[in-house]
Amino acid sequence: MAKVSLIKKNESRKKKSQSLHNKRVALKSKIYDKNISLEERFSLVMLLAQLPRNSSPTRIRNRCELTGRPRGVTRKFGISRNKLRELIGRGVVPGVVKSSW
């Protein structure tokens, strides 16, 4: 089980990223617009840099929903490989069967 503080920190990063997503996308679209002068684009880059660091989506860590484990998390289920194997073995996950050949 991961530390509760790390899980909470990641949750706050998710919330902050969602709340400032529209502002960040608008600034980036203006920055990449070639019709705007270089000075204006540079000032927009500075505005983007002033946004909170934790509002960037790259700061969010994919964690297991059950244990909070940061590594080995499947995108499809949002669960770590260990817990996924355990749940599949018990037959809890619908549509997934253990392969044998």
Curated annotation (Swiss-Prot):
GO terms for molecular function: rRNA binding; structural constituent of ribosome. HAMAP family: Ribosomal_uS14_1. Residues 11-21 have a biased composition (Basic residues). Binds 16S rRNA, required for the assembly of 30S particles and may also be responsible for determining the conformation of the 16S rRNA at the A site. GO terms for cellular component: cytoplasm; small ribosomal subunit. Pfam families: Ribosomal_S14. The keyword Cytoplasm does not apply. Belongs to the universal ribosomal protein uS14 family. Residues 1-21 are annotated as: Disordered. InterPro entries: Ribosomal_uS14, Ribosomal_uS14_bac/plastid, Ribosomal_uS14_CS. It comes from Rickettsia canadensis (strain McKiel). GO terms for biological process: translation. PANTHER family: 30S RIBOSOMAL PROTEIN S14, SMALL RIBOSOMAL SUBUNIT PROTEIN US14M. This is Small ribosomal subunit protein uS14.
